């Protein structure tokens, strides 16, 4: 997938009513994960998350959907998670469908925004799709 396709997929996801059960899988699909990968992650043996309602994709991201108002607490749990470290996750992400918080664990950069604004920040996660980004020192991008 290219950046335009990813932006479109993330925008479509954010426009739909929030589905806590399927959000992590649809988020990964938006960044180019194949149906077979999603199917494997839905299976309990592939998902090694140690956080409630979490989904861990090895070498990529640890995502958790949480109750409203708990995004910061859950992001901290993801950060402290042994599974996050063991799986060498590059990102952690917590959302309740209202708020959206993420951290790039390689740079320490943190993203906090309303869930509805998350498509504006799709570039934060482009490395999940194998797209490298070069940041401008002055603007941060």
Predicted regions and their residues:
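Short, basic/polar, glycine-containing "phosphate-handling" surface segments that engage DNA
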Residues: 1-61, 65-141
